[in-house]
Amino acid sequence: MPVLTMKQLLEAGVHFGHQTRRWNPKMAEYIFTERNGIYIIDLQKTVKKMDEAYEFVKSQVQEGKIILFVGTKKQAQETIKEEAERCGMYYINQRWLGGLLTNFRTIKTRIERLKELQRMEEDGTFDVLPKKEVNLLRKEKERLLKYLGGIQNMPRIPDILYIVDPRKERNAVLEARKLGIPIVAIVDTNCDPDEIDYVIPGNDDAIRAVKLITSKIADAVIEGKEGEQFAPASEQKEEVKTQEVQEVEDSNDDVIDD
């Protein structure tokens, strides 16, 4: 059974690409048709590519690899944070800081500064400093937390990047490619798929589409960590309901519509 069904993808609007005048010809193989000046993505390809990406992420996490979720566009920010935290990984959802991968040592010094400021606030140091100085330190802490909060506990350079809209996250893509870090990404019709190791063709502008795909990548991480099939609680309850109904009315195959 595929990770995502055609019905789920359609309902989330994953099939809507960009306007035909804003496209990358390299995405032609992932385009099904054109409708009213909009490219329609071939969801059969998306289903297949999603399965491949899911298996890759799951297998890599089973080996202890870490993943950095990246999505700084408004439609992705909340989802990137929520799903990365849900699966216990790391994220960048505000702005990609130049050198985050290629100059990680310098980034680590900023993270240490953030942790230092957090300790000062917690241990009461702020209480004995002049109010003006404390205000400046708090502003510094909030700024560092905004941009580095999602990676403050990341122990090393990530092994994999998951990206929403590699065209927007161009600097992240370039740094990852320079270091040979594999990239999994939602790739819309205006992106270059050649730069991505695991292409997931889909709409990177719709919040529901981004949420659907990103949540499945997070599920792959959780399954990789647990070594077993992950199912949200709602799905587990549904499975129990299905079994109960089948036991009572096993002659009626149409009671539950999967």
From Swiss-Prot:
The keyword Translocase does not apply. GO terms for biological process: translation. PROSITE patterns: RIBOSOMAL_S2_1. This is Small ribosomal subunit protein uS2. Coiled coil: none annotated. GO terms for molecular function: structural constituent of ribosome. One of its GO terms (cellular component) is cytosolic small ribosomal subunit. Keywords: Ribonucleoprotein, Ribosomal protein. Residues 246-258 have a biased composition (Acidic residues). NCBIfam families: rpsB_bact. It comes from the Bacteria. InterPro entries: Ribosomal_uS2, Ribosomal_uS2_bac/mit/plastid, Ribosomal_uS2_CS, Ribosomal_uS2_flav_dom_sf. It comes from Caldicellulosiruptor saccharolyticus (strain ATCC 43494 / DSM 8903 / Tp8T 6331). Residues 235-244 have a biased composition (Basic and acidic residues). Belongs to the universal ribosomal protein uS2 family. Residues 227-258 are annotated as: Disordered. The keyword Cell inner membrane does not apply.
